[in-house]
From Swiss-Prot:
TM spans (from-to): none
Native species: Bacillus mycoides (strain KBAB4) (Bacillus weihenstephanensis)
Protein name stated in the entry: Recombination protein RecR
Pfam families: RecR_C (PF21175), RecR_HhH (PF21176), RecR_ZnF (PF02132), Toprim_4 (PF13662)
InterPro entries given in the database record: DNA_Rcmb_RecR, Rcmb_RecR, Rcmb_RecR_Znf, TOPRIM_dom, TOPRIM_RecR
NCBIfam families assigned to the protein according to its UniProt record, in alphabetical order: recR (TIGR00615)
Function summary: May play a role in DNA repair. It seems to be involved in an RecBC-independent recombinational process of DNA repair. It may act with RecF and RecO.
Family the UniProt entry places it in: Belongs to the RecR family.
Taxonomy, superkingdom: Bacteria
C4-type zinc finger locations on the chain: 57-72
Keyword Metal-binding carried by entry: yes
GO biological process, one term: DNA recombination
Length: 198
């Protein structure tokens, strides 16, 4: 279908977002057109402000509006434990638990040879530099439980083996309240593998 140019540009802009296909982009574009002008201006301003005012923490790589970020700057955090995650959204997920009291290192990606992403393309060199600080005693690898995340965790684990730093991997398994019959084989395998004595 042919749309007026301003609508086409809006649709194209929405389609650049992850998970937004043509149908959803059209729906969003027309939703925006039906919004009050003040709401549209507020939405546009929020987008511009987020892009302008946010950056990556120079210590951990988490998204922040100050440097260092509030987590790295928190004196109550255990600086001896570094949890390595793939993306800033993973930090947010971990923080929602309100249990982890260490600090983070955000890789901003994962090793993926199929996509041409190697260790030097994500924040692994920054991690190694950061770990030269003698206070770090444990690195928790909390990358995603997929091929890229596992490859990244294994790569980092091998790099850190000679350092004497304790390297652990988060367990993957069954969700609380989940039924065994609905779990896939990989999840069941990881749950069994990550079992602990009670």
């Amino acid at each position: 279908m042919h749309y007026p140019e301003p609508i086409s540009k809006l649709i194209d802009s929405f389609m650049k977002l992850p998970g937004i296909g043509p149908k959803t982009a059209v729906r969003l574009a027309f939703f925006v057109l039906d919004m009050k002008e003040d709401d549209v201006l507020g939405f546009a301003k929020a987008l511009v402000n987020a892009k302008r005012d946010l950056a990556y923490c120079s210590v951990c790589g988490h998204i922040t509006d100050r440097d260092p970020c509030y987590i790295c700057d928190d004196s109550h955090r255990d600086q001896s434990v570094v949890c390595v995650v793939q993306e800033p959204k993973d930090v947010i997920a971990m923080e929602k638990m309100k249990e982890y009291q260490g600090v983070y290192h955000v890789l901003r990606g994962a090793i993926s040879p199929m996509e041409g992403i190697g260790p030097e393309d994500i924040n692994i060199p920054q991690l190694l530099k950061r770990l030269q600080d003698e206070t770090v005693q444990e690195v928790i690898l909390a990358t995603n439980p997929n091929i890229e995340g596992e490859a990244t965790a294994m790569y980092i684990s091998r790099l850190l083996k000679p350092t004497g730093i304790k390297v652990t991997r988060i367990a993957h398994g069954l969700p609380v309240g989940g039924d065994l019959e609905y779990a896939d084989e990989v999840t069941l395998s990881k749950a069994l593998e990550g079992r602990r004595e009670i």
